[in-house]
Amino acid sequence: MTDLRYTLLTDGPTDRALMPILTWLLRGCGVRCAVQPVWADLGRLRVRGKPSLAERMGLAVEYYPCDLLFVHRDAEREPRQNRYDEIMRAIGELRRDRRVVTPAVCVVPVRMQEAWLLFDMEAIRWAAGNSAGRQPLSLPSIQVLESIPDPKEVLYDLLRNASELNGRRLDGFDVSERAVRVTSFIDDFSPLRALPAFAALEDDVSMLVLEQCWA
């Protein structure tokens, strides 16, 4: 294999921040060929009604062909296992009805993916466009990340504080887009192994890499 193409299907556009994490996991699991990630931007497609998760997965594979499909759902207020089972049912439905056999991995952060972006202060400063900033930032400890009720708002507040902007300049600060950039400034995601949801994802990726002989 000269390259490995993966497609990420997410709840929303800001969740494409997961891509550097997924690429890092693949590398850590032994993938040495070129990795070509793409985010499935289904919002560009004209689709009637509200497609089911299985239908969205089918569209992702059809319009963004890949060797591996990552399917993201935030657990939010649901137990992580509920979301995981939901994705697995959709995978089974897709394979029965559409004969799509692309390998798939469930990506289910507890609460929401922003919880996985709250451990690297320097990355937050870089993403905020103020890498030399001196405004104190209070990051939660890694052990409590999965218990934070609204990690997105915590991340957004950190980015606003890190920017050290105020007034109209702060009003024009696109915090959601800045949040997407955080992972691009992180080289090592190993601290997240302390989180059960992340550890489970790494185990699933490792197992699939071995099954597919990608290492």
Task: Provide a role label for each language-model segment.
Residues 1-5, 15-43, 48-68, 72-215:
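C-terminal accessory helical subdomains adjacent to catalytic cores in phosphodiester-
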Residues 8-10:
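Short hydrophobic beta-strand that contains or immediately precedes a catalytic carboxylate
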